[in-house]
Amino acid sequence: MPEGPQALQSPPATIFLLLISAAGLGPGCQALWVEWGPPSVTVSVGEEVRLQCTHNGSNTNVTWWHVLQSNSSWPPVMYRGDVGAGGELIIKPVNKTHRGMYRCQVSDGKKIQRSCGTYLRVRDPLPRPFLDMGEGTKNNIITAEGIILLICAVVPGTLLLFRKRWQNMKFGADIQDDYEDENLYEGLNLDDCSMYEDISRGLQGTYQDVGSLHIGDAQLEKP
């Protein structure tokens, strides 16, 4: 069995290949690249916008170029704005003159890469609503209004029904007794009555049953 130090020895060819690989992957041999970025960004007048310029360079110089909106065939103009860490372009506050295409250029020594560009759209601010409330608050208000309307419609009618019932229970018996004690013939002048409506006959029947009488004994009442 070989000793320990002899077993840990590596062939020179393997060490040479590892050195070549490390040299090939060093910072100087890496290709510089820049991300495309979003195709467009929309903001309102007066807001702040931040355009990213993501790249893999270590010692780079980032510049931004602005392509005017009126004519894209014109050469881009260097935009001298506020550039943050990592080449981020900061525009605040935004106005309509900032519209157009923005491209970042990354320089690392002799290597230069550019992004595809991001178009900045600037629109007028949305009108502020009279009642700036959320949807949940609006739904709660509508529910409360419905409950209030239901109460306003049901409660008065219910109170009127109970009031009418209470009046009938309190005064119904007295009114009924008054109608029973009232003399229906009070104030009636018997002389002015028709002879067919003579109420002074007492219990005498108005008509006679001629079917139950004999013909000889029939005595019809004369009018």
From Swiss-Prot:
Domain (ITAM): residue spans on this chain: 174-202
- Residue ranges of every copy of the Ig-like C2-type domain listed in the record: 32-120
Residue spans crossing the bilayer = 141-161
GO molecular-function annotation terms?
identical protein binding; transmembrane signaling receptor activity
Membrane topology, from the record = Single-pass type I membrane protein
The residues exposed to the Cytoplasmic compartment are 162-223
This entry carries the following GO cellular component terms, namely:
B cell receptor complex; external side of plasma membrane; IgM B cell receptor complex; membrane raft; multivesicular body
Tissue spec. comment: B-cells.
Under Pfam families, the record lists: Ig_3 (PF13927), ITAM (PF02189)
Q: Where is this site: Required for binding to BLNK?
A: 207
Q: How is it modified after translation?
A: Phosphorylated on tyrosine, serine and threonine residues upon B-cell activation. Phosphorylation of tyrosine residues by Src-family kinases, including LYN, is an early and essential feature of the BCR signaling cascade. The phosphorylated tyrosines serve as docking sites for SH2-domain containing kinases, leading to their activation which in turn leads to phosphorylation of downstream targets. Phosphorylation of serine and threonine residues may prevent subsequent tyrosine phosphorylation. Arginine methylation in the ITAM domain may interfere with the binding of SYK. It promotes signals leading to B-cell differentiation.
UniProt cross-references to InterPro entries, sorted A to Z: Ig-like_dom, Ig-like_dom_sf, Ig-like_fold, Ig_sub, Ig_sub2, Phos_immunorcpt_sig_ITAM
Topological region Extracellular: 32-140
Give all cystine bridges in this chain: 53-104
**Signal peptide per UniProt:** 1-31
The Gene Ontology biological process annotation of the record reads:
adaptive immune response; B cell activation; B cell differentiation; B cell proliferation; B cell receptor signaling pathway
Q: Which residues carry this modification: Asymmetric dimethylarginine?
A: 201
Where does the record say carbohydrate is attached? Answer: 56, 61, 71, 95
Q: Where in the cell is it found?
A: Cell membrane
Q: Which UniProt keywords apply?
A: Adaptive immunity, Cell membrane, Disulfide bond, Glycoprotein, Immunity, Immunoglobulin domain, Membrane, Methylation, Phosphoprotein, Receptor, Signal, Transmembrane, Transmembrane helix
Residues carrying Phosphotyrosine: 185, 196, 207
- What's this protein's function? Required in cooperation with CD79B for initiation of the signal transduction cascade activated by binding of antigen to the B-cell antigen receptor complex (BCR) which leads to internalization of the complex, trafficking to late endosomes and antigen presentation. Also required for BCR surface expression and for efficient differentiation of pro- and pre-B-cells. Stimulates SYK autophosphorylation and activation. Binds to BLNK, bringing BLNK into proximity with SYK and allowing SYK to phosphorylate BLNK. Also interacts with and increases activity of some Src-family tyrosine kinases.
Q: What is known of its domains?
A: The transmembrane helices of CD79A and CD79B chains and two IgM heavy chains assembly in a four-helix bundle structure that appears to be conserved among different BCR isotypes.
Under what name is this protein listed?
A: B-cell antigen receptor complex-associated protein alpha chain
Q: What gene is this protein a product of?
A: CD79A
